[in-house]
Amino acid sequence: MSRVLIIESSARQQDSVSRQLTKDFIQQWQAAHPADQITVRDLAVSPVPHLDANLLGGWMKPEEQRSAAELEALARSNELTDELLAADVLVMAAPMYNFTIPSTLKAWLDHVLRAGITFKYTPTGPQGLLTGKRAIVLTARGGIHAGASSDHQEPYLRQVMAFIGIHDVDFIHAEGLNMSGEFHEKGVNQAKAKLAAVA
């Protein structure tokens, strides 16, 4: 049995293409892997606080010196990190907002990129500690950005995943969604057609 962690980050509940892709992905994954355990964390329904002084203090101070607010922030970060550590497959559903990922997804990443837990510093540089895991990224984009200089989403997420040791990363892009009805339908259909290859 494998554990799949799905991170939803679209601000929209209705008419969200990234959520449509997630729904279809779950159906196909469950059909192919009925014994697997799937956990969904929705960052729109339960937002993760952005990085702040309390979390930094919780990370850096000895336990006896942490304030109540720092302990609370650390406990939240530990919960998110433990979910990631337990997962065999990470799925991030990410619409493109202003050429990159939603700030809610960035906040989640800030909580789980943890020195000594998901990566470590060595004499030769940082080393990812989550080797052996797989990541799948489902994106929804108003324009067509794949391979273009305007894409600050895929390169960033590939870099972050590699930093924590995840090198097996697949991207499925639904693009051109705001260009016209024809482009929208084509973009959604092409993305959905690729789901079977990763599920």
Curated annotation (Swiss-Prot):
Top-level division of the source organism's lineage: Bacteria
| Keyword line | Flavoprotein, FMN, NAD, Oxidoreductase
- Cofactor binding, note field: Binds 1 FMN per subunit.
The entry marks the following residues as binding FMN, namely 10, 16-18, 96-99
Single GO term (MF): oxidoreductase activity, acting on NAD(P)H, quinone or similar compound as acceptor
The catalytic activity of this protein is classed by the Enzyme Commission as 1.6.5.-, 1.7.1.17
Cofactors required: FMN
Q: Which SUPFAM superfamilies match?
A: Flavoproteins
What is catalyzed by this enzyme?
2 a quinone + NADH + H(+) = 2 a 1,4-benzosemiquinone + NAD(+); N,N-dimethyl-1,4-phenylenediamine + anthranilate + 2 NAD(+) = 2-(4-dimethylaminophenyl)diazenylbenzoate + 2 NADH + 2 H(+)
Summarizing the function annotation, the protein's role is: Quinone reductase that provides resistance to thiol-specific stress caused by electrophilic quinones.
Family classification: Belongs to the azoreductase type 1 family.
Could you describe the subunit structure of this protein?
Homodimer.
Q: What is this protein called?
A: FMN-dependent NADH:quinone oxidoreductase 2
Species, as recorded? Pseudomonas putida (strain ATCC 47054 / DSM 6125 / CFBP 8728 / NCIMB 11950 / KT2440)
Q: What is the lineage of its organism?
A: Bacteria, Pseudomonadati, Pseudomonadota, Gammaproteobacteria, Pseudomonadales
